[in-house]
Each structure stands twice: as C-alpha cells, then as structure tokens.
C-alpha cells in the first residue's frame, strides 16, 4: 500500500470501528428508517469472512480476562476490541503489525483487504445502514493539531465521526474534556474514563460500548424483591431479584455442570445466562470457553421460572494494559506508529469501556401494568423449570444475525461494579 493511500484506508476502518462498536439494545426515540433483512444479511456477510479467526481471538480474550481473576466481576466486548485492534493495526510498522496479526491470525488481514477492495460507494451504503441501526453511541477519535489535516478530512468525508482537537500537553484539562465528552454521549454511564495521558500523545481512540437490555418480554416489577446472593461460602449479599415465568430456550449440560437460559431482546440480540452448579463455578470457568458452544446446541424450548438479579456492570481498561495479556506488545510505542502526521512524536492512547445494564424493562412500555400481557398459554399440568441465579454466573450478549458475542461478562458479586 502506498503511503498516500493510508489515510483513506485508515479512515474507512475507523468508520467501521465506530459503528460496529456502537451496539446498543436501548430503545431509540426516533428511527430514521427501517432496516430490511437484506441489509442485515449484507452486514453479516461482511463479518463472516473473518469469522473463524475472530472466534479464536474472542476465545483467547475469554480465557485470559475471565480466568486471570476468578473472584472479580469482569465484562468486555470481544467484537469491539477486535475491530478496534484491526483499526490500530493499519497504522503500525510491519514488525508490530505482524505481532498483532499473529494473535488475530488472518482476521486483520482480511479486514484490511476487504476495505481496500470494496468500492467506497458500497462501503458507504453499508455504513449508512449501520448508522441508522446503532447511531446512539459512537467511538470518538481525539487528536491534536499535529495530525495531518488531510487524514482528518478523509474521516469527515465518509462519516461525521466525533473528532476533538485537543492539546495533550495540558493533561488535566484534556482528561476533563474527554471524560465529560464521553459521559455526555452515553448518558453518564462512564466516569473518569481517562485517568492518565502522556503529554506526547498524538491520538487517543476512546472505544466505548453500552448495552441496556430491553427484553422482548419484561420482568414483572411487582415481583422484584431483595434476596440472598451467595458469593461464596462465607459471603452473602442482598440483591434485587427479578422474576418471570415464560417459555424460553433452556439447556442443561452435565459435562459443563451448568444450566443455560436464553432471553431475547430487541434489535436482534439475546442475553444468554449460564449458571454453574453449586460449588462448580471454578470448574465451569475453566471449561466455558471450549464447551459453551455445545451447551447452546443442545437446547430445548421449555417453560421456565427465571429468577435473576438486576445487573449493572462495567469495566474500563487501557489497551496498553489489555493487549499484552493476550500477547500483543509494543503497539503503543513511538517506533510502532506510521500514521501520516506533521510531527515526530507519535504516541497512541486507546481505552476500552464496556457497560451492561439489565433491569425489568420490556418492549411494551406499560407491560408491567398489563395483566393480559403476563398470561402465559401453557398446559395447566406443566410444571416450570426453576432456574435461580443466586450464585456467581456468566452472561453473554449475542448478536442473533452474526452469532457473535457483543459482550462477555462474569458476575461474581452483583453488588459490586
């Protein structure tokens, strides 16, 4: 690739990065247009070209991040991290890029090749469809005046991404500005996102993703009450437990020693809850990455009485700390970056922030007050399976179109964020 083409290619990756990372199941107040199934198929086809490699990368993230501290809540977005890493890789020197690609296998190469091969008009068509689907929360690119202005114009040409020109030498003012900007974008869900900035920073990529689970069928708010959650043998906390009885996908694995239920949400997403047997959390934690797929394949549609705590969890981590954990090094050094700049100092900062919130909310605005809404047509002789999440469990938010994990979470103690 010629040096002159780099800004265009990178800007296209940033477009996709911002859009793919901006997935939210929160009900939108307005919708510019309805997305047709054909549009979703085209988006899915774009992602399927690197599906096998993405899954391997996501599994590596799962094993590394979830297992490293088994007694701590953890949440991250593998799709968000992988797309952002693909973005960063296109601005790296060959040696560093090879290190990143070794971890992601050919996934990054595929993404780069796709972007260079597709006509801009075709890309823009998909981009606009994605904007209409997920426009509420977007990645922001924050850099300073040393960045080549043609590079910035190319980004602005293809999408109105949020670009803030900031002097990173004024660290305190810059941190405050970034934190306020992101907080305003995601309804104050992120606090103190940026805690450290190097004065020599050239570009800061803030990668945030917020999921508010709007369920197809809400929980009954009048049944929510305080109950015990058994963190471990010595620790019991009181949490708000939600309840509902309905037919849903249910699975039981004696191999994994765990039970799974799947709850549909709006916007083609589902929440998958996996409950390890009592005393088997550590066993399930070690086996989950490899055996979860089998658990989902052997499922049944059954009447379930579900009891689960309200969930609000978040994690923020600098890529500088996150990536070495999965074997990607030297990505943020002054020797790594080759982006077209007007200065000589080139330090890159990138932050990942994931937030998930699941409450009683459903698609029907007044569903909790509608008695007919709660009538479940079942055989009176049928006894529901009781699944009570009163001990540590796993949570996955899955895209029903691509079957990708938008979020992966380990809920060890619902009382701590």
UniProtKB/Swiss-Prot annotation:
Q: Which residues form the propeptide?
A: 26-40
What PROSITE patterns does this protein's entry cite?
SERPIN
Mind telling me which InterPro entries this protein's record contains? Answer: Serpin_CS, Serpin_dom, Serpin_fam, Serpin_sf, Serpin_sf_1, Serpin_sf_2
Q: Provide an example Pfam family for this protein.
A: Serpin
GO MF annotation, one? serine-type endopeptidase inhibitor activity
GO cellular component labels: extracellular space
Q: Which residues are tagged as glycosylated in the record?
A: 132, 222, 268, 340
Among CDD domains, the record links this protein to: serpinA14_UTMP_UABP-2 (cd19559)
**Secretion signal, residue range per the UniProt entry:** 1-25
Q: How is it modified after translation?
A: A series of at least four post-translational proteolytic processing steps and differential N-linked glycosylation generate various molecular forms. Three mature forms starting at positions 41, 45 and 100 are produced. Glycosylated; contains the so-called mannose 6-phosphate lysosomal recognition marker.
Q: What induces it?
A: By progesterone.
Compartment(s): Secreted, Extracellular space
Give the top-rank taxon of the lineage listed in the UniProt record for this protein: Eukaryota
Site (Reactive bond) found at 378-379
Which terms are listed as keywords in the entry?
Answer: Glycoprotein, Pregnancy, Protease inhibitor, Secreted, Serine protease inhibitor, Signal
Name a biological process GO annotation. Answer: female pregnancy
What other comment is given for this protein? Answer: The UFAP are a group of three (MW 42 kDa, 48 kDa, and 50 kDa) antigenically related, basic glycoproteins secreted by the porcine uterus.
In which family does this protein belong, per the annotation?
A: Belongs to the serpin family. UTMP subfamily.
Per UniProt, subunit arrangement is:
Heterodimer with the iron-binding acid phosphatase, UF.
Protein name per UniProt: Uteroferrin-associated protein
Q: Which organism is it from?
A: Sus scrofa (Pig)
Q: Taxonomy-wise, where does this protein's organism fall, top ranks first?
A: Eukaryota, Metazoa, Chordata, Craniata, Vertebrata
